[in-house]
Amino acid sequence: MVSDNAQLLEQATELLLRYWVRALTSLVLVAVAYLWTKRGYQAPYAPSDIFVPSTSTYPSKVYTSRSKISVSQFVNDFLHGRIELRDAHSGRGMEHIAQVVSFRFDLTLAWRIFRTFMSTSHTEYQDKRNVEKYVTTSDSLLEQVLGPDRLPLVGYFRDEVPEELENSLAVQMERIGKEYLDLNPNDRLLDVNSQWGDLAVYLAHDYQVPTCAIVATSSQLNHATNLSGESQVQRFLRFVTGDYRAVTQCLPAGLPPFTKVLAIDALDTIGTRNIPAFLRSVNEVMESGGRFMLQVTTTPSSLGYKPNRRAFSGHQQSIMGDSDNNRAEDGDGFKIQGEEEWSEHWWYHWFRQRYIQPGADTSMLISVEQVMGELQRAGFEVIQMESLTTDAATTTAVWCNRLCAAKRQIEMELGEDAYRAWELYLNWTQSLYARGRLHKHFILAMKRA
């Protein structure tokens, strides 16, 4: 027994003498890698230039140093009221956030992404539960921020000042009816994801077009039904309760197919893997040559689930054909580079699903190029795309202003935690739109014969 131990000790000593250089080098590399992940980034601004720390935490080494703070600490401190954003009312509260907050990819983010994917299955039951939770908890807040119609439509600010959001929305709705859908009384319109029904009521009233609108919850149905009664469009408009799976219910047997279909932000909550099935179901209820219009929120192609080589640029483009004048390589302001830019994308979408809208994960994984590719595969020909990213930034800034103006009422109805979560969410969203790291588009497609 003693001899065996002596032999093992001798062998271990021999191995150590032979490989001690490699072992020491490995330990040094591991130590360097660990220290590198814990390094502090130099911040161009002091955090106190962007945050307004509360008296209980300021002065503090964390908020007065010129080293970046972690995004986990920032989100936690903000939601607990320890800090506030400067210029939050203007929507520019997160304009320089990347200068003072470190959006590095770490195990915390990896775990949160994993939990998000594991908890989001997009079954019919879970999708219904998520949208009911979102509508129930956010209804009164959305009325204060988006207006009584709660329409998440991007304004058209070519001829309007930002403060006149209602006027820009009216112009946008008119453009949808005339320029995009070209509606007339002989058409048959399907409105998927009709929200609270206001856009469907407007189109049915102004264009006298028979319309079927899909709303998600009973509260939305009650609002839409009352609005249609006030507008006296019941003979043109009917509502169906459900989600994208209810598309076929809007076309009973014996009725002619729809000539026009509208989907405002319908892709947001259906899940990336369900997009092909949704587009095929829309194709099945449309007649050949019918128009299909979508408003979509997407991620730059360099951050998408399957990055593409090309990205579209410019405000409004015709994409019939493949002209170099209509296409541009990634790098025209939309290419995302660097670890922190990539990680911020994931932190933002985790925050949105965790605190604002559960299940809204489609824009996290898909780019506008992928949406157009899925449309092509589903039997549509994409004929026009319009970038709304700049208008979306302006619209979101107006929403931020309205949120701050209604702060006291929102805190009384929903609590301070809900208000702070929405303040951070809207300012963060506006910042991503303004920096081209979140995209908004109109897409017009036509069903192929």
Residue ranges and their predicted role:
Residues 185-195:
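Conserved class I S-adenosyl-L-methionine
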Residues 2-168, 182:
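Feature captures hydrophobic
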Residues 231-249:
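Conserved SAM-binding strand-loop segment of SAM-dependent methyltransferases
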Residues 289-297:
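Conserved beta-strand signature within the Rossmann-like core of class I S-adenosyl-L-methionine
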Residues 196-207:
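Conserved SAM-binding loop of SAM-dependent methyltransferases across substrates and taxa
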